[in-house]
Structures are given as structure tokens and as C-alpha cells.
């Protein structure tokens, strides 16, 4: 029967209302980043949710959940061929169950069943039932499963006695029991069918009632909700075939919640889950099942969800070398709770389709530990075998991802996690490092909670990050794959268990007084509803790799109580080689801070290898771990050289349903009045560290000299990282750290280059003063020898004095040459100190000097250049300025600058001869003294004259209003527009208050500027960084003519602009054929003179003329000042393209900016004005919607330039 629901339609209507009332500007998203769930598509596609597929309707009642009866024979054949390895795993699981029925069968008595956590019984039923379906001849197994289900159906309920408020065990039991019932339906007698079905009905009804009152019914993206909703859906689907409309209500409830889940997951651009890998595998198990069931039963297609496309990396990039252990962010065991082989084969079959999922599932199964703490729990190890069998696609040949075999850095910008060396075999050279500094709930959830774009989200009440840890700025280190520093995994939420800093004495300490760690600690679950905890956040400042060197840093001050009066808790990690890790803590506190002590912790869970005290070079205290005579060492010191002894402790903590042992090194430092800096060095057995010390510790940053394997490395790290000018001054570029050694300097985020001089430092083997003293002593000794000779051999006094004079002159000359070659200062007594100090500052800036960037963005209107705002918006490094706006307008010049496009090129000679003085002064003011320029803008209420001017500027748009609205209404509307523009100026001013060194980014809306970049070059000089955005002419013309109603072509009044292009109006000068006219526009002028020219032809000639002229004119600009960027590259390859743009600017791409551009290009949740949603699919929508004759016309006109830019022909 067709299942239609008014309730579901009501849900859609509420969603439409919620999105229609969403504010324009949200969090780190610009005013164009409007969250939209593609309501039109939602309506057309998802109102059919409850219309079962006709195929299912016509087939037998059961099985129908994951497959129908007609597929069983094929599944049995696969068990002997392509699926043999999975069948063997299922058969092995069943053999183990049959060998120990006392353990695996549900207890005969309900009291025993309810006495402990009992998810094992629901989890093991589906693979057992699938085996019986594949091997109906195995009567022993079938009798076993009947006894299994008879016992479960005989219980009065499936609750756990000591957890009466937790329905998760019921959810597992219901999912398993209903799935097994569906699989075995045709093998059961009628009595059992009816009895089992009644039990499923009763339990499903209970779950539905619980969903209305329990927190899991409201808390999204949480493992409890996903688990219980899948249970409710499974029960509804199984009973709904036989029972009526009540089951449909249950289905509706699940779909409403799970579609919200999928919608929110789409905001998470990196495929992660905030609950960590272990619980993430738990939630993902249910999400993949929902996606499959929703498509199979309701025709709901979520396979384009961006989170699913990225979720593979959540498993691959968190794996330590050897494929057995994962990084344990948040509550975790050593790897996964459920799967992840099932999730991986699902992703491969339906999303990736490249064999990578099958390959990783294969590696994980191959390397599964047979014993020890990393063995999967008996309650969970087989729970996803049935879905893995059903989803496995043998046609996808297992193959690793691209670049497999080389250690790579992977950044999860939403999660706030960086890993290095993941997904590799366990060999001596494969090292793993992880770093965590993220926002509570992940960036997307955090922003949604704080900026409330959706009315159906009730702040933190709609989420449950209770499994997260107080772990901002935490890290792990496994040189050679041997875990040296690990997390403490599942346990109480205490900061000292998470390798982060704690402080004392703190007035707000809630446990371990007087010490206090990060917000939300001190309980079994993170107290995310506590005071200030909802605002807790860390931030990864930078993450970059060059060769085997990695630099990562994070700020965690917002994760600590404001009562501690901390200004910065900045931690930097530098992996120098596969076995040497330098960790630096920079702590800055306010003058009235009560804190005077800081304590660091480093954990290891491996009971076989214990930490013992160690002393480095009899100078610094440390600790060592002996792994079969291989020594892994650490030591520490502050910027004064202090190195206190550590306390090495062991502890047992509650974890899941057991105790887990841990050990940790705890070292406490006394803090300085304002700034405290501490360095920790971790290194493996094949490394010789011979010295390590601070050589600079100033306000902007620090330098550490570290001698590793007889090579000196000078590490420079900026701690005033928000200040771009400070970074340029301290390092010579816009990054955050550099490493110099004898011959090269590595600038993290930009690259490595050779340096002319070897590293020089203040330890000089033969200083000048020492040489001078040696020379004087040598002269005296030789003089005494000569006197002795004179006395012994009676030499004449005259001859003696001649010899002495010659000797003195010779020695003086030699000393003079030595001074000439070494002394670089006028007063040589200061040579050693001055040169040493100078070397500190020059080490990092050795080589090519870079200027602070002044960014200019230009393009033809409609080319999508506005998307670059996502790279620069809400950044401490940049101030994104739209030009023009009501208050930032371009002054008039000798030549008119058309607001759409013109054909005038400004030559260097014209600029240098004194033209455009007013415009030149305006630009210098806006760029070089931005703060003063903005302050001098008077934000007064616009008078009638200003309104009239505004009307004139927008006359095309206003004609529409005049037909519909009265003059007072128009004035009111214009006043509102001016109010928005005034608030825009105030926002720019506020940004400069927080980040005074932010560099301006001028986004020029007129296409006229594409031919005038030489003007910016002359005014701004070497600091100019021009980004010229081009777009496929077919996509551009489609966007201009068809992508919005009314079209951009009409709104911009393009025909009028083109008609004015070659005219002279009102005495205003225009460039002509003899002066400043770009000759590429001549074909367009001829086209305009034709009476039958159409819009497509005109726009094609316009694109060709403007683009060709811009490419010719801008060829003269240096590659360091000008870069062409294709809009399609930004959308299709956002990370690669934006990294190239930021390298051009001399600044590393931050994870926050990366997250913003990924959100804008990958989620279908971001749109540009007149453009609609931005996604790789939508950039090619012209291929489906643009008439073929128009495509051919565009290609005929533009082909030469299209080919040069790399745009292929479509009509071929």
C-alpha cells in the first residue's frame, strides 16, 4: 500500500520555514553562506519516502529488510566464491558460539539476562541468522538460533536492571532480533512467526514511546540516538509488512530524526565524528544502515552526502602503523567498537567505487590481533558481519589510496585533529603523530549551537558531547610505530589523563584542588552543560609538512576557565625526523592571574614497558622507556634552563565495564609573571641528541638550538601568531615556524630553500680575543728564545733587533689579515656578542625576502570570485573588503570606470605621468592605512540627496520597485540598505581592533579592473598580490542568462553597459583606438554593430575580449605579484587550489580557512548571489541545461582561448 503522511509533510513545511527565516550572516560563514537543505529537491524526492518500491511490494513478506527471497540463492553461491572470505568469518563466529552455548546463548532466567549489559545477544543474532540462511542444511546451528530466539522472546522485557533509564541494550536486542526474524522468516513455523512478530511489535512500540521522552530522541549526532532509531526503524519495517498504519508513524518518526542527522552530517566537511574513532564507528554503523534502508524502502537518496564521501579518511587517517590501533580521541578502546569493515565496504560500493574501502577492510581483518587488549569485545566483534557480507562488492578490486606508502599529514579541520604517518605498515621508519585542538562538538556543531541558524536546534540540548575529553592541545607520538606517548582512552573526564596542561592554584577548581585543567572535567561524562563549558574550544593554528618534517600548533586558552586569567595556552609540535619530536608550550597569563604553577603529563598504556627516570647530559631531567633494550627518551627544560624532576605515577581508571591501567610522567614548572616557555624533547633509540637550549626567548617568539646526530638545527617559532606583521618580521615570511641547519632553511607552509651561509651561532671555536692573546704570547715566547740565542751565541744587538722587528711586523700582518676576514664590527671587542645576536634574527629570514601581501581580487562579474571570501573572511591575517559599497566607493577619475566592464587599459606610463592622482591617494589610504581610512568614514543617516544618488546607482533594479512600491517604501528600503552597509563598516573596524595587522583584501566587483592591475602594481609596489579569477565561458554565460530569475544579464543591464562601452557621454573621457583601448575588444565592437546579434553571441565576444586582453596585459606582471585562478579549480580541487593561493601570498593555509572553503564548495549548503548552490555538480549544470546550439556558438567564438586555459570542448 502507498504510505502517505501529513506529519512528514508538516516536517518539511517546518524545515522550509526554518530555512527561510535564517539570518544572512552566520559565524565564520559570510552573508552568502546561507544554510539550505535544498528544499525543492527535498520536496520532490522525499515526500515519496513511504511509498515502498513496487518490487518489494510484489515479493514475499520476508525477507525484505536488506534483500528479498529472490536474492537468497545468489547469496549462497557467493559464499562459495567471491564472498568466501566473509563466509568463513561468519562460519567461524557461529562455530565459536556453538562451542560455548553457556556463554553465547541468552540465559534461561530473565534475572540473569537483565543483571548486566546485554547487547551481546542482539549483536550476535544477525550473523548467526545469516549463516543459517546461507547453510540451511546445518540443523545444529538452526536449532541453536531457535533456542536463542525462544529465550529472548520469553523475557518480559529487554532492559538492563542497573541501567533502567538506558534503552541502548533494548535497541541492540530489537535490531538483532528483528533482523534475524526477517532473515529466517521462511524457515520458521507459523507459531514462531506469530510469537516473534508480536514481541517485535511490543518492543518497537515501547521504543517509540521512549523516543518521545528520552534525551536520545532529541540529541542529534549521538551514538545512542543513531542506535535506537535504527532499532525503531528495523522493528517498524519488519512489523509494517503485516501490521498497519501504526508502524508508518514509527517510520515517519525515524525518518524525521535521521534526515536531520544526515543534514547536519553534511556540514561536517572532513567526514569525522566528534565522539572519536571508537564511538564514531558505533554511530557510523547505524548511519550506513539507515542510508541503505532509507533508499531501499523509501526512495530517499543520501548517497551524495559529502560526509559519506569523506568518511573513509576517518578510518584511514587515524590508523597507527600496522592497521591494528587507532588514535583514541574521546572515549575509546584501542581501535573500533563496531566494524569498521562493514562501513568501509559500504562506502566503497555506494560512494567511493575505487577499491580503497575494500582494501582497508582487508588490511584491518588481516592484521586483527588474536589476543591482548586490542582484541574486539565478544559483544561487538561479529555484529556487522551480516551487513559486510550483504554490501561487499567483489568487482571493486582492493587497492590502497593514492600516495599510499609515504607518510603524509592529514588535517581534519572540523574535528580539530591532525595526524601524520597513518595507514602504513608497521616498520622501523614509519612513525605516527597526532594532535588535537578543536571545538566542543566539532566546528560545525559548535557554530550551529552558537549562531542558531536553524529553529529546530535548541542549543546544546540538541547534542550530547559527553564522550568527548578535556583534550585540547593533546598529542600522541609513536616513533617506529612503538607508542611512546598515548592517550588514556575511555575513562573519567580528567585533564591530566589527556596529555594537556593543568594549572594551580585555580579559584574555580572542582576536583584535584588546587589544580584545574580544562572546562567540563571531573566526572564520568564531559559536563558540557556546565558554566563556560559550552564555549570551550581549541583551534589548530597551522599544520604543514615538508619531507619528513612536520609542524603543528594549536591554541587552547578558550578551553580553560576564565577565572585563571590566561591569555594564551599555545602548544607547538615539530617532528624533526621519524624519531625526534620537539614539543614547545607557550603560556601567557594576565597580570592579575592567580596561577603560578603549570603541570604537564605524558601517558603510556603499555604495561610491559614502564617509564623510569632519566637525566640528559647530567643537565636536564627526563624519563625513559626501555622496549627490549631500545631506549625511548624524553627530557624537558624551560627558557631559563630549569628542569625539575618528574613524578612517574601509575593509576587504574574505570573504562567501559572494566578497569584500565595507565602510567604517566608528571612534571611541574613554576611560571613566570607573564610568559612561560617550556620545551620537551622526545626521541627514539636510533637518535643521538647532544645538546638542546633556548637561544632566544622574546615577546614575538623563540628559538631553540637542537643538535641531532651531529647536525645543528635552529628552530624558530612565533608565539604572537595572530600578528601577521610579527610573523614576517621574526621569520621573514607569513608562516609560524622555520628550521635552519647547515645548508638549508625549511619554512613550514612554503617550502625548503638553500641558504648561502652555514648556520652561525654564538659558540665560536676560536674567538678574536683568544687569537689576539695567543699571538701576543707567541711573540713573547719567540723573543725570549731569541734573547737566549743572543746570550748563548753572542749575536750583535743590531742584528737581534732587526730580527725581532721583522718578526713583530710579520705577526702583526698575519693578525691584521685574520681581523679583516672575521671581524664584522667597528669595535672588535663586541664582535662575538653582536654577531651571535645578529645570527639569531637572520637565520630565519635568510634568502628571499617577502613582503606583507596586499591582495586584490578581480574578475568578470558572475565569474564566482566572491567564493574567495571564504578564504579570507574571519581571519586574523586578512580584512576582506568589498569594493564598491555605499560607504567605500571609488572616487571619480579622468576616465570613467564602468561598474560592469570597459575596454580601457591603464599603462604604466600614464600612471607615472601623474594621472589618477585622486584614485591613487584613495587606494594608498585604503590599503596602507586601512584603520584610519575606515575611521574617517562618517556613518550618518543618509539624506535625500544620498538616497537619490543610491537610486541612480541602482536604477535598473529600482525600476522594478517603482512599479510595485510607493516612494516612502522605497526610501525605507534604501535606509535599511544603508543601515546594513553601515554595520558592515563597523564590523570591519571591529576586526581591525582585534587584529590590527590584518592585511586588506580588495574584492573588486567591476570587470573593468581586470585590465588595470598595473595601476595597483604602481601604487602598492612589490606587496601587491593580484588574483584574477576566470571561468569557463559556457558556465559563465549560463550563469548570466539562465541561473536566476530575473537573470543577472537583466539585473546588471548588460546591453546598456555594452552599448556605452565605446561611446563618450557627458564630457567624460573614454579610451579610444589610439589611446589605452584594448584591441581585443574590436570584434565585440563589430558584433555590437550588427542588428541581429543575440545575447549569447555578445557575451561570448565579451568573455573572449576581456579575458584575452587581461591575459596579454597581465603577462608583464611578475609571478610573485599575479596569479590566475580558475573558478572550476576552486570548486573541484578546493584544498589543492587554496594551498596554491596561500603559497602565492606567502602564508600557510590555516585549517579554519580550509574548513570554510570546503564547506562552500562541497556541501550544497552554500550559495553565491545569482549563482545558487555551489558544488562540483552544479558547476557543470550548463551541460544539461544550456541548448546545444548555444554551446556550439560559444565554443566557436571562444575556442582558441578556452583551449589555452584548459577548457575542453563539450560538443566533441
UniProtKB/Swiss-Prot annotation:
Could you tell me where this protein is found in the cell? Membrane
Tell me what topology the record assigns in the membrane.
Answer: Multi-pass membrane protein
Q: Which GO terms describe its molecular function?
A: chondroitin-glucuronate 5-epimerase activity; sulfotransferase activity
- Family indicated by similarity: Belongs to the dermatan-sulfate isomerase family.
PANTHER family on file: DERMATAN-SULFATE EPIMERASE-LIKE PROTEIN, PTHR15532
Documented effect of changing residue 1090 to E:
In a colorectal cancer sample; somatic mutation
Q: What is its EC number?
A: 5.1.-.-
Q: Which residues belong to the signal peptide in this entry?
A: 1-20
Q: Which residues are glycosylated?
A: 28, 666, 688, 709, 874
- Native source species: Homo sapiens
> What's the chief localization of this chain?
membrane
SUPFAM superfamilies, per the entry = P-loop containing nucleoside triphosphate hydrolases
Return the Pfam families for the record: Sulfotransfer_1
Lineage at the top is: Eukaryota, Metazoa, Chordata, Craniata, Vertebrata
Keyword Protein transport carried by entry? no
Q: What is the protein name given in its UniProt record? A: Dermatan-sulfate epimerase-like protein
Describe tissue expression.
Expressed in different brain areas as well as in multiple other peripheral tissues.
Its transmembrane ranges are 764-784, 803-823
Entry keyword set: Glycoprotein, Isomerase, Membrane, Signal, Transmembrane, Transmembrane helix
Lineage, top-rank taxon, reads: Eukaryota
Question: According to its record, what are the GO cellular component terms?
Answer: Golgi membrane
